[in-house]
Amino acid sequence: MDVEDLERLAISAYMVGREEACEEAWIAAHQVWLCRGEPERAARCAFWLALGLFFRGDLAPAKGWVARGGRLLEEGRADCVEQAWLKMFVGLPRLFQGNADVYPTFVEAGNVAERFADADASMFARLCRGYALILQGRRVEGMGLIDEVMVSVTADEVSPMLAGIAYCQVITLCQAVFDLRRAREWTEALVRWCDSQPGLVPFRGNCLVHRCEILQLQGTWTEALDLARKACETLAGPPAWDTLGSAYYQLGEIQRLRGELAEAEQSYRQASVAGRDPEPGMSLLRLAQGRLDLALPAIQRALDETQDRLMRCRLLPAAVQILLEGKDVAAARTAADELAGIAAEFDSMYLDALTAYSSGAVLLAEGDAKAALPLLRAAQRSWRDLKAPHQEARARLLIGIACQALGDGASARLEFDASQGALEELGAVPDLVRLAQLTGSSRHGGPLSRRESEVLLLVAAGKTNRVIAAELFISEKTVARHLNNIFTKLQISSRAEATAYAFRHGLVR
């Protein structure tokens, strides 16, 4: 096989997830170039192999191949575009550890790449420069470079392997800085790119994770659940990808929000095994399980270990919620104030909404409903603008509590009804339970939705799932799902207990 064909084979194998074949092809091409006395081309093969290993999380072999490529360039002393890749590999590990001081390294690499008119190296240097600028706090400049990177990617100016890497890194970066608009736009672009190449494995798995995160926020939880499961299957390999932990974490998040608590715990545990810290999801799960004694130390441990300010923003809202549940209002105030301080440094509607909600919740706990109300309304408007129905419903619940505290029972009822309607549509079982606990009532049967109340009545009448499905014109699978929700909401485990609940609460006469 010709050496150029070996290089094409290596890239194709990488794109379809055949890592062993990819490595073998790069190594073979590397050896051919060495035998031909072309160390620069041999070094390039070493760098491409290292790039795939680096983004799969195999850092030790990646460093080994970079060292070999660097030695070849040093021996040849050639002025070539491969020198740009060597410079970037020197800075890459430090950049991904959060060190912004490597920015000049990527400027130098970009200059070399531009001089040789190498589109791949130029794009990658620009991506790393944008990342470094954002780490320096120069977010506007950094995101400008990121947009430029994505223009070259969507215009098909770079190789497929680097295009996929750029998509995933840019979306991850947008999510890290809470730039939801860009994250949504580039996720949709990644979906289209993956759909046009159905054989992709690494990028399709990452694409599913990113898409799942967007769908979760938008409230499309059933589709998000399916995508999360597919992402776990795709990324599990062999070989397993380093983003497998994120896929399991995302699966756990959706299961937790739907009240599938046992399944969520298993998913969080699998995320941990795959290398992803399951916080704050695990702490919020413990809270939903009524295990405040486990939730408090877990979220505190996560905060103690996390120094990065943006990463702390992912933990602080959960900390506020858990601390308020534990009646530690002073500590919740400290966490909310820290969140507000960080959010003030970033132009992010998402962060502003998190801050307004958390601060409003603390003010409510402090007994200042009048001050809490405008913050909670601001949060609710932001969540609506962001098309985040679950977050909006949670804000409306607190708005209702604030209105009630101010003596406006009619407005409180409107907010409670709006919140419950949205939560029922989402299937947010734990939040429906919380709503019933906080308000002392609901529209149908305690925390149950109208359809769940209908199913409960038929269960109390002694009817089987098949008969219930026929009477309500729904599938037996849907009946089973409603029963699972009923058991979770009412904290029961059998049809007999469900029947007893129906009689005890006057639903059956």
Residue ranges of model-derived segments:
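Inter-repeat boundary and helix-capping residues of tandem alpha-helical solenoids
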Residues: M1-D2, L6, E19, R36-P39, ...
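Amphipathic alpha-helical segments of tetratricopeptide repeats
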Residues: I27-E38, L51, A67-E75, V107-D118, ...
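Tandem amphipathic alpha-helical repeat scaffolds
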Residues: E7-E19, A43-L59, E82-N99, A121-R139, ...
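N-terminal regulatory/sensing modules of transcriptional regulators
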Residues: E260, Q266, R291-L292, I322-A330, ...
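Hydrophobic packing within well-folded, soluble alpha/beta domains
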Residues: C22, C45, A125, G130, ...
